[in-house]
């Protein structure tokens, strides 16, 4: 009986040890799986990032001069489908703060920035998930068949690529460049030419395109 009990106890002890070892091995494997999964999630959640830089028509940096009061970013995924719209305030631009953009399942995104749009002078496309990048445009409003004077518009575009070699966010520069200019016209000798100083006189600039497309190029009808 003693031998039998000793044998049974040995078998039980070996069984318990084997079970403990097996459980430890499974626990280690599970930790590896969790760690690997967490790493993948962390990499997927790393956002794209841009910093806006305002430029005048001469190519000079005017970001900190306060001439840009804010901007609207239009984000398109790797298929050029509209993803989201982001409003950026003036302080973010002045301080050159990075703007994070989360666009899941896209290795590349295109960001288009518009600034200075005035609802009284221009209208911009109302974008939704059904739109693509070529649907975005800014159009001049008209008054009695004459296009309104455009506002102080800034435009920029950049394509961002996801960096798979690092887990940290890398900020990319997005330059927004002034698209309009202000000039003055003066006419001398008008009264002498007309023989009178009565009446109102105005200048009309012809052959201006009515819109700017998603690349910031003139398009549409002449106004």
Residue ranges and their predicted role:
Residues 51-53, 74, 114, 186-188, ...:
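Residue-level recognition of well-ordered beta-strand positions that form the cores
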Residues 56-61, 72-181:
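Short, low-hydrophobicity acidic/polar segments
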Residues 19-50:
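Bacterial Sec-dependent N-terminal signal peptides
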Residues 69-72, 199-201:
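Short beta-strand/loop motifs in extracellular/secreted proteins, especially
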